[in-house]
């Protein structure tokens, strides 16, 4: 059967991040979700499956580089800057995806952008970062998935089969390799 657990200690996202961080170095992990917050978990071994029938996408480091011009480790910084309407998080005024990508390319991460805001060439962006620094730091704390919560099950306790069909066979059957 399928393992089930409940908690009031953390969100499910934290457990998913915990599994990705704990097991992603040594095994392939595929997170099936439309929640873009999981993009920050992507590594060479951890990918995000966004199932949409014929438009199914497996999000990898290359996908993030192509789509956003950032590394997966910068995704929480990116969303902190641009905001996330689905989570009611307001980013910095005048900072859209292209500007956020450019700032991250130049400064590396959100904290460096804030600390070096005076070096931002465009005055309206510089002023927005300075004015919104506290909110941007709060955004980061809300968006960043740490994955440090105790996990309810080990991977050995989580195998799933149904009528002799393994999870991998099901995924291959829908075109996920």
Predicted regions and their residues:
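Extended two-metal-dependent nuclease catalytic cores across DNA- and RNA-processing enzymes
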Residues: 1-153
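Long, highly charged low-complexity segments enriched in Glu/Asp and Lys/Arg with interspersed Ser/Thr
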Residues: 168-177
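S-adenosyl-L-methionine-dependent methyltransferase catalytic core, i.e., the SAM/SAH-binding region
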Residues: 162-164
């Amino acid at each position: 059967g399928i393992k089930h657990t409940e908690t009031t200690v953390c969100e499910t996202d934290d457990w998913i991040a915990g599994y990705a961080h704990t097991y992603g170095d040594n095994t392939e992990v595929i997170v099936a979700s439309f929640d873009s917050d999981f993009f920050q978990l992507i590594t060479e071994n951890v990918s995000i499956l966004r199932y949409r029938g014929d438009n199914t996408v497996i999000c990898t480091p290359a996908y993030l580089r192509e789509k956003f011009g950032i590394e997966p480790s910068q995704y929480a910084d990116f969303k902190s800057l641009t905001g996330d309407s689905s989570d009611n998080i307001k980013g910095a005024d005048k900072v859209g995806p292209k500007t956020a990508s450019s700032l991250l390319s130049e400064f590396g991460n959100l904290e460096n952008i804030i600390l070096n805001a005076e070096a931002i060439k465009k005055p309206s962006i510089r002023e927005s970062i300075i004015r919104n620094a506290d909110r941007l730091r709060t955004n980061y704390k809300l968006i960043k998935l740490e994955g440090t919560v105790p996990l309810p099950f080990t991977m050995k306790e989580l195998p799933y089969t149904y009528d002799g069909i393994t999870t991998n066979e099901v995924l291959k059957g829908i075109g996920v390799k």
